[in-house]
Each structure stands twice: as C-alpha cells, then as structure tokens.
Regions:
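Short, internal active-site loops enriched in acidic
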Residues: 82, 157-160, 226, 309
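Hydrophobic (often cysteine-bearing) scaffold residues that line and stabilize catalytic clefts
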Residues: 35, 39, 53
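Active-site diphosphate/adenylate-binding microenvironment
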Residues: 49-107, 115-122, 135-139, 143
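Phosphate-/polyanion-interacting regions in eukaryotic proteins
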Residues: 157-159, 169-172, 176
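Conserved adenylate-forming
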Residues: 109-165
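Short, surface-exposed acidic
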Residues: 67-74, 146-147, 291-302
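Active-site glycine/GP-rich loop and adjacent strand/helix microenvironment
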Residues: 1-32, 40-41, 45-48, 173-414
Length: 414
C-alpha cells in the first residue's frame, strides 16, 4: 500500500481520481444509478488515459473506430480479449510505456501443458487490489474484519501466495488487518513423465492449531474440494477414531465461532468429483458450526469468490443472501456467444466479460470463458450474476480456470 501511495502515476489526473475513489468513502452507499453514471465516466477517462500512456492503444482505438471520449459498453466489448492472449509474455504488448517496477507477477498453474497466464501488477495496482477486494469482501461478508481479531485457515500452501492472485489477496488482506493466517497445505514437488507438477498435502499441525484455537471469528478459505474432502473424512471415521479426534482437536463439529464463515474460491468447478454447490453447502453445514456476530447459533454461512489471474478484483457471493457481485467500479457484462455483443436481457446466458477501469498498467478488459446469467437486484450494483458453467473445449474454448479450480486440481491429483 505504501509503495502504491508513492507512485509517480498518481501525478496523472485519472490515476489520482481512481485512487481517491478506491481509498475514499464507501462506494457501496451510492445508488446503482449513481454508480452506473460513475462507471460510464471512468470508462471514457480510462481509455483516454491509456491513449496518453501507450501508442499501442492509440492505434488500437483508431483501428476499431473507438472515440475514447464517447466510449460505450459496446466499444468495451470490442476491446475485450480472451484470456489465452495473456499466456507467456502475452501481456507485454498491452502494458503502458511508463510502467513502474517493484510490483508482482501472478501466473496460472500451467498444468494444462500450455504456457501459464502471467499478469504483472505494479505497486499502485497492488494497493488498489488490496483495498478494493477488502471492501468488496467486507460488504458481502456483512461486517468489518476487525484489527487483530480472529484466525484464518487457508487450504493452500504459502508458496502459492506468489502464484495465485486469490491466495495473494487473502494473505495481503489478513496481514493488513493483523489477523493470523495459517496455511493448511504443504507443496510437494514431483515429476510425472519428466514434467514437474505440484501436489498439495495437508499440514496437520496448522489444521490442528486452527481447530483448537479459541479466537473468533474463524475464517476458513478453501477450494470447494477442500471443504468437501474434510466433510467426507469426518463421515468415514468410526466411533473410536472420531472420539479420539474430538479429544485432540475439539472436532467434529468444527466450531467457527461468532462471525465464522467458509469462503470457497472459484465455485464448484475443477476436476474434483463434487456434488452441486447447494448440496456441498448442505453437507458441510453438518460438520461446521457458526454463530452470528451477536452470538446466535446459525447455519454456517458460505461465500464464494470468482477470481482469476487476469482480474484485479473478484466477483463474490454469499450463499442464500446475494449472488455474485463485482466491485462498484468494475464493469461486469455478458456477451452473446455468437455475436460477442453485450446482452442486455435479464436471465439470458452469456459469456462473462470483465472491465476494471482502476487497473493502471494495462487495459484490463477480457473474457475468461465463464457462462453466467444476471438478474435485477436492490443492492448497490443493481444486478447480480449467477455462475452457470465453463465454456467447453468442444465449443472451441480451452482457457484458464479460476484460482479455485487450480487449487482443486492440485488437491485431487493422484
């Protein structure tokens, strides 16, 4: 955050405006109409910003006959790229000329046999990523993560902090909040047919520490496979083993305490043989116990984060309360799979497109290959998004899975 606040890019009026909006008063208090108007102005200022900082975009806008000062959502749809174009060094062509060093590069797993998607985040982008995602998370969570209170378990390995953006966001946010983060997995390097690959194995010490902790709230971050596998483990225990485990750890059930929650990453996709997400939630609620912040016993709440390497901010939902919503300044839209024109009709399936006007290093507008629908909402965004499925290889689509899917593959690979 400190490096971002010292960025020379803040001398640009657009970056300064975006920074002030992200770091300022809550955007979630604005009406959907005010936010839509704000996104429209940012859309146009954003394209003008990139035209000032890279001749690549000047040429691109001319070729596509886009006037940045009058840019519409249809123009943004024309600018959207498939995530495949970011594999290897693909992002380099899209980066601004006066790119600032000192940031971090995130990548996909590379387990598909192709070059992984790699995306560089400058110091100012990292600061915006941290603040924007934290604000969105707390809004959907329904409360502020209080400084130094609680403990979190992430069913991932610490090495993935510097690889997967979902892990990085959680790590950075909890570090900023002074909340203890335990990693529940270790990374094991193996070789298969001469190709290195990685497998996640359980860190029993950290898992036990989380289970025995008296801190509240307990935040459990995992791919959907993680919570499913843990539930199956409890169900398969005999009486004697379950009794011994309960003496050692206090579980089952796993008590998450006041404000305790399970946060999954990426929905129920990946290569695990998983039940539908509603069934996964129902099964898990037999083994996890939570209380409201007031101390009342409730069904353990679930949140799901749809994030991928390519996006600075995620879409997040809270099961049974709200479907997926983006950050107030992010533009989430659906594209017709045949025409790639924006879909305006409610309830129609389309390819998710994401435009983040607050990303300063490259014009972050892309489609990762997820089919979704949208419906009207009384919330801050005016609409919510429902995940349906990935586009398949048979449909001509062979792109990157979200971070949660990557974690699932690592957790279930034999």
């Amino acid at each position: 955050m400190e490096n971002g606040s010292r960025s020379k890019l803040l001398e640009d009026p657009y970056v300064k405006r975006v920074w002030d909006l992200i770091m300022g008063e809550s955007l979630f208090k604005k009406s959907p109409e005010d936010l839509a108007s704000l996104r429209e102005s940012l859309r146009r200022e954003c394209l003008q910003y990139f035209a000032r900082h890279s001749p690549y975009y000047v040429d691109l806008f001319e070729r596509l006959e886009i006037d940045p000062a009058k840019a519409t959502l249809h123009d943004i749809a024309k600018l959207a790229i498939p995530s495949d174009m970011l594999r290897g060094d693909g992002q380099k062509r899209f980066l601004i000329q006066d790119l600032e060093e000192g940031g971090e590069t995130f990548s996909s797993s590379g387990t598909t046999g192709k070059d992984p998607v790699r995306v560089y985040r400058s110091p100012v982008d990292l600061a915006i990523m941290l603040k924007a995602n934290t604000d969105l998370f707390e809004h959907v969570y329904g409360d502020v993560l209080k400084q130094g209170e609680g403990v979190a378990l992430f069913m991932a390995a610490p090495e993935l902090r510097y690889k997967l953006s979902f892990v990085a966001f959680v790590d950075l946010t909890l570090d900023k909040k002074g909340i203890e983060l335990l990693y529940g997995m270790d990374l094991e390097d193996k070789a298969q047919a001469g190709t290195p690959w990685q497998k996640l194995t359980t860190n029993k010490e950290n898992l036990l520490k989380f289970l025995k902790s008296k801190k509240e709230p307990k935040l459990f971050f995992t791919a959907p496979a993680g919570v499913h596998i843990l539930g199956q483990k409890f169900e398969s225990m005999g009486f004697g083993k379950k009794f011994a485990y309960k003496l050692a750890s206090g579980a089952p059930p796993i008590r998450l305490g006041k404000g305790g929650i399970i946060v999954t990453g990426g929905g129920s996709k990946g290569f695990a043989d998983l039940p539908p997400y509603p069934q996964l939630v129902s099964n898990a609620q037999k083994h996890f116990v939570s209380k409201s912040v007031e101390g009342k016993q409730i069904e353990t709440p679930f949140m799901d984060v749809l994030g991928m390497t390519e996006t600075l901010t995620a879409l997040i939902d809270r099961y049974g309360v709200m479907d997926k919503v983006p950050h107030p300044l992010a533009e989430a839209f659906l594209l017709d799979p045949l025409t790639f024109e924006p879909i305006e009709e409610e309830g129609m399936e389309g390819i998710l497109g994401i435009f983040n006007p607050f990303t300063t290093s490259w014009l972050e507008v892309f489609y990762p290959g997820d089919i979704m629908t949208w419906h009207s909402s009384k919330g801050f965004y005016g609409k919510e998004f429902v995940y349906k499925r990935r586009l398949s290889v048979k449909e001509g689509w062979d792109l990157q899975r979200a971070c949660g899917g990557t974690l699932e593959e690592m957790m279930t690979k034999q």
